Every structure is written in structure tokens, then in C-alpha cells.
């Protein structure tokens, strides 16, 4: 983008575009994370309020982790139903189950999310299961909660805090319903 032709979508160093900028000003950049560290008095922020919720959720590292969590949950459900059918000799009724998983996402490759960095990523899947043991299938209704509980701390990456800065939490939450049927062996 040529600056003479209107608003530029890039930051420049020595006339060379180095990174995209947010023309709307709706999401935080590194300077905003620093400003909150120095002046926010430790108040927790959410990805939604700082304009990075969709960007985080749609990033390749996070989508990959969501997919991995879904695969693990699917395998868990099939094993759980099979075990319940075996335990009750095929006479199991509907039952509730919960599956939890924790991993780490790395979004440092996105210039806008570098301050979020490596985040602990959680999922919790609560389901109602209606098995049909004779046919080897089941119906499910689930509510999946994906979330991060992160901190903005150690901004120099040397293990020290700035004497005037205050560590603060960065949280993000997403809820996804699911309903369907599956088979098990």
C-alpha cells in the first residue's frame, strides 16, 4: 500500500513493509499488552474484549488442537459406551459423561498474538449418551467448552518482571454444542 494513496495496512521500517496493522483499531497489539501490564493493575482481560477471540480461535495452531481434542473425545466416547455395555451386559440406559483434555497452543507466529504466545489450552466435554448395545451404536448430545487461562508476564523473556508492571490474566472461552450418533465395536 502506498501511503500517498490512503491509509496503509502495514507498519514500515526504512520504507519496507514489515507487518500488517489493524486499520479498525479493534484489537490489541503488543503495545496495548504492555500498556495494560504497566497501567492495568492486574485486571484480567478476555480475548473477546481485546478483539482477538476470532483470530485466536481461527488460527491454525488452535484449530489443530481443537481437532486433536475432538478426536480424543470421540475415541473416549466409543470406549466409554463399549465399557458400559459390557459392564451392564447390554442393559445400560442413558448416562452422562465428562471428558477433559489439556494441551498447549503456540500462536507466536501471528504478529498480533505474539504476546499471548504459548497458552495452556483446555477442553471439557459434557455429554448425555443413549447407547444401543445390540446394534453397536449410540446417540449423544454434548456441550464442549474450549478455553485458555493464560498470563501476561515476564515480558522481557529473561525471567524478571518490570518493577512497575503487574502480571495479568488473559482468558478466552468458546462453547460448542454437538448432537449426533456414532458406532462402536
PLM features: residue spans?
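Catalytic toxin/effector domains delivered as secreted proteins or via bacterial secretion systems
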Residues: 35, 39-40, 44, 52-185
Amino acid at each position: 500500500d502506498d501511503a500517498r494513496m490512503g491509509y496503509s495496512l502495514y507498519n514500515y521500517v526504512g520504507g519496507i513493509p514489515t507487518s500488517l496493522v489493524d486499520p479498525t483499531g479493534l484489537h490489541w497489539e503488543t503495545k496495548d499488552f504492555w500498556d495494560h501490564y504497566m497501567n492495568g493493575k492486574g485486571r484480567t482481560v478476555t480475548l473477546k474484549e481485546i478483539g482477538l477471540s476470532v483470530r485466536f480461535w481461527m488460527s491454525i495452531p488452535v484449530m489443530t488442537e481443537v481437532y486433536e481434542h475432538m478426536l480424543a473425545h470421540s475415541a473416549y466416547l466409543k470406549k466409554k459406551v463399549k465399557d458400559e455395555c459390557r459392564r451392564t451386559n447390554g442393559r445400560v440406559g442413558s448416562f452422562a459423561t465428562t471428558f477433559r483434555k489439556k494441551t498447549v497452543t503456540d500462536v507466536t507466529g501471528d504478529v498480533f498474538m505474539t504476546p499471548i504466545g504459548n497458552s495452556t489450552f483446555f477442553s471439557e466435554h459434557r455429554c448425555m449418551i443413549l447407547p444401543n448395545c445390540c446394534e453397536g451404536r449410540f446417540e449423544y448430545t454434548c456441550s464442549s467448552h474450549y478455553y485458555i487461562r493464560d498470563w501476561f508476564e515476564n515480558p522481557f523473556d529473561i525471567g524478571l518482571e518490570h518493577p512497575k508492571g503487574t502480571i495479568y490474566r488473559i482468558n478466552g472461552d468458546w462453547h460448542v454444542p454437538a448432537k449426533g450418533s456414532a458406532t462402536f465395536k
